[in-house]
Design a protein with these regions (language model features):
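Beta-strand elements of modular eukaryotic interaction domains
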Residues: 30-34, 49-51, 139, 335-336
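Well-ordered alpha-helical segments embedded in enzymatic catalytic cores
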Residues: 13-16, 105-112, 136
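Preference for solvent-exposed, low-hydrophobicity sequence contexts
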Residues: 1-8, 12, 16, 20, ...
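Structured beta-strand/turn binding interfaces of compact recognition modules in eukaryotic regulators
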Residues: 3-5, 46-49, 56-58, 62-65, ...
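Phosphate/Mg2+-binding loops and adjacent switch elements
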Residues: 111-112, 116-171
Length: 464
């Protein structure tokens, strides 16, 4: 397990370590040809803010067979011989937004690795190592069967090192400290890297010869994937707006123009609420089952076991949009053991006339059709990811680039003033021109959950 504070170089070290663990293996065939292959390496990415092989907001388990020679935005998803084994849509950029769910996702991915893989495993942790983040980190040391811990940064903080040394000693795991190697070149900020990874993900245009191909056209020029949410061809079971309960009549506005996770549930929707003793065994027994869409039963965790409310879990707005109802004025994420992430999408629009979602996603339409034919339930999960402002302004940036190119060819300066920007903004659904900007009024309000993390046992499931 590789851990350390932000900016310590954990991702770079994991990249180099994975490449070093991919020794070439000669395989002799009857014809005498000896092609070069690689022993696979497991990679558990627990950094939702800057993941290596997925867009921000995902926690994933991968099997690597190819060397990684580029930054994350060059491979926003696993391709070629690399394979994503299982992923969860965390919906946030830091574990601090839901520490319990983060911990349970990590345990689920690790248990999946133990059941299916025998290769070495590299675990890349988040850079949040202070306060509750340190508690989560030490719990991971106790909860995972580690053979070694690498802490990047020999400068501390001292309380972090002391807690890690104690946890490693109790778990009989060696702890190694390495000095961070700072780059002499200027680096992009974390927000810039997230934007580049997200942009790269949504501009993917398939894989050719084991390499990702991209479409450089603005997303506004791409045809969306039209998915019904009502009727006999309904492909989206419901939407989930994580966090505090929202007024359902605003759900279409909350979805349009934002990034959502596409979650697949392997049974009826089981949400991440309060668990009782023995409920984990029940979930393990039910894992892997796929129930038909007609059985919309709601299994909520209560202190006396699994309960089924009469109202059911799925309600509909006035415009017919199905949504998972809140529990205790809050919408909890799905149980990791009974769900997985398919990827992400940008909701281009909600057509309440045809009862369809218009999605921009690199996921092939054949994948949705296959899941629908096998009666798999698909949910759209709205979390707290960055707003894709870059997608709103791509057409404007393209126009400016063409104008500069024409100026270079003709040598004449073109007039491009505020009126031209206003005309462009009038045609955009989520963009407007603000005179002088607004200081702080447009900033999203983020709420931290699970502040009483240590007050509950590690095996307990719950959110505060």
């Amino acid at each position: 397990m590789v851990c350390g504070p932000k900016g310590a170089g954990k991702s770079t070290f994991c990249r180099m370590l994975a490449n070093a663990l991919l020794p070439k293996v000669s395989k002799t065939h009857q014809d005498g040809v000896q092609p070069q292959g690689y022993d696979p390496v497991g990679f558990l990415d627990l950094d939702p803010g800057q993941p290596e092989f997925s867009p921000p907001g995902e926690l994933s388990l991968l099997k690597l067979k190819m060397c990684n020679l580029g930054p994350p935005f060059t491979h926003p998803t696993a391709c070629g011989d690399n394979e994503t084994i299982k992923a969860h849509h965390f919906g946030c950029l830091s574990p601090k937004d839901n520490t319990h769910y983060y911990y349970q996702c990590a345990l689920d991915l690790y248990s999946h690795y133990r059941r299916t893989a025998t290769s070495p495993l590299i675990i890349n942790c988040s850079g949040w190592v202070q306060g509750s983040g340190l508690e989560v980190l030490t719990d991971l040391v106790h909860g995972l069967c580690l053979t070694g811990i690498i802490y990047l940064s020999t400068t501390g903080p001292q309380e972090v090192l002391g807690a890690l040394e104690g946890a490693a000693s109790r778990s009989n795991v060696p702890l190694h400290q390495l000095t961070s190697q700072l780059s002499e070149f200027p680096t992009r900020t974390a927000a810039d890297q997230r934007m580049m990874s997200t942009l790269s993900y949504f501009h993917m245009h398939g894989v050719e010869g084991g390499n990702i191909r991209w479409n450089a056209s603005p997303l506004t020029n791409m045809a969306p994937l039209v998915v019904p949410y009502e009727g006999p061809k309904q492909a989206i079971l419901a939407i989930m707006v994580l966090g505090d309960e929202q007024n359902p009549e605003f759900y279409d506005s909350l979805l349009e123009g934002c990034v959502v996770g596409i979650a697949v549930i392997q049974q009826d929707p089981v949400v991440f609420g309060r668990s009782s003793k023995g409920s984990d065994d029940k979930m393990t027994a039910m894992e892997g089952q796929i129930l038909p869409k007609q059985g919309h039963l709601f299994q909520a965790f209560e202190q006396d076991g699994l309960q089924t409310p009469e109202s059911g879990p799925i309600l509909r707005t006035a415009s017919g949009i199905p949504y998972l109802r809140a529990q205790g004025h809050s919408v909890h994420p799905l149980l990791p053991a009974s769900s997985y992430s398919l990827g992400q999408a940008i909701v281009r629009g909600v057509d309440t006339t045809t009862k369809t979602f218009h999605l921009l996603t690199p996921i092939p339409s054949e994948t949705f059709q296959s899941l629908h034919q096998h009666n798999c339930n698909i949910l759209l999960v709205r979390g707290r990811l960055d707003t894709p402002i870059w997608a709103y302004t791509e057409q404007l940036a393209l126009g400016k680039g063409r104008r500069l190119r024409r100026e270079g060819e003709t040598g004449e300066k073109e007039v491009y003033g505020p009126d031209d920007v206003d005309k462009w903004a009038e045609k955009q659904p989520w963009a407007s021109v603000v005179e002088g900007g607004r200081s702080g009024s447009g900033k999203a309000r983020r709420i931290r959950r699970d502040l009483r993390y240590r007050s509950q046992g590690r095996g307990d499931v719950g959110s505060v």
